[in-house]
Structures are given as structure tokens and as C-alpha cells.
Design a protein with these regions (language model features):
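Divalent metal-coordination and catalytic microenvironments
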Residues: 24, 65, 75, 115
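Histidine-centered active-site/metal-ligand motif
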Residues: 22-24, 195
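Juxtamembrane membrane-water interface segments of multi-pass membrane proteins
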Residues: 1-19, 35-59, 73-95, 116-135
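Hydrophobic alpha-helical transmembrane segments
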Residues: 25-32, 97-111
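Extramembrane terminal tails and long inter-domain/linker segments of multi-pass membrane proteins
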Residues: 83-92, 121-195
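Hydrophobic membrane-spanning alpha-helices of multi-pass integral membrane proteins
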Residues: 28-33, 59-72
Length: 195
């Protein structure tokens, strides 16, 4: 990072909690957040079932809050000289360690709640159509979960950013391409396979 790459600040921050916080801020903030976001985005396509939106939102809030509460105090401790890999520390760092510990528990609960909600929805979640998010890109035109060959008929290619090209089909309970909304031009409908 910028602080650890500059000699004037790295001399002070080297081998402190700042290094620990920076590493975990990048890895948890970038990797874990992307993993959870990708799982929630693709879950309906993978399983053909929708996750519990409330559990997803609560899990997201807890992960975000716990993540910042865990690692932000470590930046402060490191900038104040708290070395890493020490079992004991000065009393001035006690409150920061306590907040960081509370944040770790909140983060863990958020991750656990998110995964429990996803696993539960894979078996008990409400069935969803092939396009529950009104997405205009090609992958959302195949069934959820996708068939072995993905498409039975030639898919309609639209601009992936033209969200007005999608209309809601109440019979299928999903969004479909506007071109398929007209029965004269639509291919035969195929109901999603039961699980």
C-alpha cells in the first residue's frame, strides 16, 4: 500500500498492527466481499431458488459493520506503535483490542448468517424464474438452473445495458426479452424442471 511503500512512513509502521490491518482490509474487504456478492448474485441461477432477501441484507450489514469494526482499530493501534505478534500490550491499547474482538464476532455472525440463509434457500427457498433481477445479459435468458446445453432455442441478443428490453411475464414469474413477450415471435415455453 501507499503508506507501507513510502520510506518515511514505513519506518514507523513496519511490523506493527498497521500491517496486519492493511493486509486484512485488502483480503477481507476485496476477496470476501466479492465472494459473498457473487454468491448472492448467482444463487438464483445456480439453484433456481431465491434467497431470503431479509437475511441477505442483515448479513451484508453485519459483515460490513464487523469488518470495519475489526480492522479499523488495528490501523490506529499500528500508527500508535502497537507491534504485531505480541501476546501482551500496553493498557492504552486495551479498548482498541476489545473493539476489534467485538468486530470479529460481529463479522463471524454476519458470514455465518449469510451462508445459513443461502444453504437454507437452496432447499427451501421460493422457486424463481430464469431472470429474477431483470438483467439484460445473455446468461439470464437460460433456465434456472441452466439446462445441459443452456439454450433450447437461439437466444435473443440485446444490448446488455438496455434494461428496458426486459418485461415481466406473470405466467412465468420472471423477466423476459421484449421480443418474446409477443406470442407470435416467441419460441415455445418450457417450464423450469422441478428439483
Amino acid at each position: 500500500g501507499l503508506f507501507l511503500g513510502a520510506l518515511s512512513t514505513d519506518i514507523h509502521l513496519h511490523d506493527t498492527y498497521f500491517v496486519v490491518a492493511h493486509f486484512h482490509f485488502v483480503m477481507v474487504g476485496g476477496t470476501l466481499t466479492a465472494l459473498l456478492g457473487g454468491l448472492f448474485h448467482w444463487w438464483p441461477k445456480i439453484w433456481g431458488r431465491m434467497y431470503n432477501d431479509f437475511l441477505g441484507r442483515v448479513g451484508c450489514f453485519l459483515v460490513f459493520t464487523g469488518f470495519n469494526l475489526t480492522f479499523f482499530p488495528q490501523f490506529v493501534m499500528g500508527s500508535r506503535g502497537m507491534p504485531r505478534r505480541y501476546a501482551t500490550y500496553d493498557p492504552e491499547f486495551l479498548a482498541f483490542h476489545q473493539w476489534s474482538t467485538i468486530g470479529a464476532f460481529v463479522l463471524g455472525i454476519g458470514i455465518l448468517l449469510s451462508f445459513v440463509g443461502l444453504v437454507y434457500s437452496a432447499f427451501r427457498g421460493p422457486r424463481c424464474g430464469s431472470n429474477p433481477f431483470k438483467a439484460a445479459s445473455l446468461e439470464w435468458q437460460s433456465s434456472s438452473p441452466p439446462d445441459f446445453h443452456n439454450f433450447i432455442h437461439k437466444p435473443v441478443l440485446n444490448d446488455p445495458y438496455d434494461f428496458d428490453s426486459q418485461v415481466y411475464d406473470a405466467e412465468l414469474d420472471t423477466y423476459i426479452s421484449r421480443e418474446f413477450a409477443d406470442p407470435a415471435t416467441a419460441p415455445p415455453r418450457k417450464e423450469p424442471a422441478p428439483h
